[in-house]
């Protein structure tokens, strides 16, 4: 694994100076680790979490080696309420505060409804939707008593809006993330908290490469105006904007990160 980055990717503008940012599902080379890297480049300290302990440690070490800010890591299974609560508690204990939560965890699959088991449906909904609820709840319980407000950014998907064969469980979960984003944003406003979501179309990462065929990936990429998938850092840049004070009048919004043909 190599987290080295191009200059245009790492160049920061201080958007998150002094902030503490938590990113879930941040092990490896996908959107989570790219978001942590972008947050560091923008002046934040970060806490990354994942249930893959070894990969999480490796990612934390490589992020730390960039020399951009403090990096902590917490092993966390987002399907466990106790572990999610502990993630937020550990962050505030170690870092002294929490400013931004990025809910990045998700799980997909390729199964038609007629062939899908209850367990498969439940697992995808738990990881991709209920985990967002768990972490949002834990963060809001902290933010409502904090004097500085906060930000939550959720990772949804264009499949929350669009139909795709064999993706009913994942699409339903991501549509739920969009609805949770909008509804919780109304509630959180009284705490000075903003909640938004990004909705990527197709972004390259190892999990996608393993679960989707080369033919499917090529077909999906061909549907983009640029004829390619997004790089994780391109999604992370939008997340950083939503986490920053430059989006201070945005809440309850779902921002599409795609270049779809009209």
From Swiss-Prot:
Give the E.C. number(s): 1.1.1.-
MF terms from GO for this chain are:
oxidoreductase activity, acting on the CH-OH group of donors, NAD or NADP as acceptor
Top-level taxonomic group: Bacteria
The known regulators of its activity are described as:
Requires the presence of IpdC.
Q: Which reaction does it catalyse?
A: (5R,7aS)-5-hydroxy-7a-methyl-1-oxo-2,3,5,6,7,7a-hexahydro-1H-indene-carboxyl-CoA + NAD(+) = (7aS)-7a-methyl-1,5-dioxo-2,3,5,6,7,7a-hexahydro-1H-indene-carboxyl-CoA + NADH + H(+)
Q: Where does NAD(+) bind?
A: 50, 77-78, 104, 170, 174, 203
Task: Tell me which Gene Ontology terms the entry assigns under biological process.
Answer: cholesterol catabolic process; fatty acid elongation
Q: List all membrane-crossing ranges.
A: none
- Which Gene3D superfamilies does UniProt cross-reference here? NAD(P)-binding Rossmann-like Domain
In this protein, the active site sits at 170 (proton acceptor)
Which segments of the protein form a coiled coil according to its record? none
Q: Which keywords does UniProt give here?
A: Cholesterol metabolism, Lipid metabolism, NAD, Oxidoreductase, Steroid metabolism, Sterol metabolism
Q: Which InterPro entries match?
A: NAD(P)-bd_dom_sf, SDR_fam
Q: Which pathway is it part of?
A: Steroid metabolism; cholesterol degradation
Q: Which Pfam families match?
A: adh_short_C2 (PF13561)
Q: Which family does it belong to?
A: Belongs to the short-chain dehydrogenases/reductases (SDR) family.
Describe the task this protein carries out: Involved in the final steps of cholesterol and steroid degradation. Probably catalyzes the oxidation of the 5-OH group of (5R,7aS)-5-hydroxy-7a-methyl-1-oxo-2,3,5,6,7,7a-hexahydro-1H-indene-carboxyl-CoA, leading to the formation of HIEC-CoA.
What name appears for this protein in its UniProt entry?
Answer: (5R,7aS)-5-hydroxy-7a-methyl-1-oxo-2,3,5,6,7,7a-hexahydro-1H-indene-carboxyl-CoA reductase
